[in-house]
């Protein structure tokens, strides 16, 4: 697979970039936020991602390698497709996304139309595990869900639970997180 191509951008429509390289034409889905950095009728370097769904190859072109890498990470999460990945990447820049993922800011992901609580948590957990080696165990997920039902903010719970040792049982873990949450709100 190619990491990137550098070719003549000869057409852009609502969905695709059309790039010619060595007398071959390539068509890429693209982020609308990349439009400002693309130059029509000039050579453009585009970072490539490929997704195969039901034996259909889809090619994606990105102006930024880090954004392309985040896209690949997102579409490899179960139930997250290109539309959800594009929605996230078009609404936040790279640094904002890293902050959102690092700090477990599900509230920011939930602001996007069509993304519910389960999906937002799945995205945050998966990206944290991949980028920051933060794995949320089933035990911690049960505590998070319980405290959310009691009305606590997911982002506050995450800030605390990420750094807690796995050795505690669910009751002790819940008590500890509740205690820490009380300090946050005082």
Swiss-Prot record:
Family: Belongs to the RuvA family.
Primary role: The RuvA-RuvB-RuvC complex processes Holliday junction (HJ) DNA during genetic recombination and DNA repair, while the RuvA-RuvB complex plays an important role in the rescue of blocked DNA replication forks via replication fork reversal (RFR). RuvA specifically binds to HJ cruciform DNA, conferring on it an open structure. The RuvB hexamer acts as an ATP-dependent pump, pulling dsDNA into and through the RuvAB complex. HJ branch migration allows RuvC to scan DNA until it finds its consensus sequence, where it cleaves and resolves the cruciform DNA.
Lineage, broadest ranks: Bacteria, Bacillati, Mycoplasmatota, Mollicutes, Mycoplasmataceae
Intrachain S-S bonds: none
Entry keyword set: Cytoplasm, DNA damage, DNA recombination, DNA repair, DNA-binding
Xref: Pfam families: HHH_5
Region feature (Domain II): 64-137
Species assigned in the record: Mycoplasma mycoides subsp. mycoides SC (strain CCUG 32753 / NCTC 10114 / PG1)
SMART domains, per database record: HhH1
Gene Ontology terms for molecular function: DNA helicase activity; four-way junction DNA binding
Name listed for the protein in its UniProt record: Holliday junction branch migration complex subunit RuvA
Gene Ontology BP terms: DNA recombination; DNA repair
Chain spans, region Domain I: 1-63
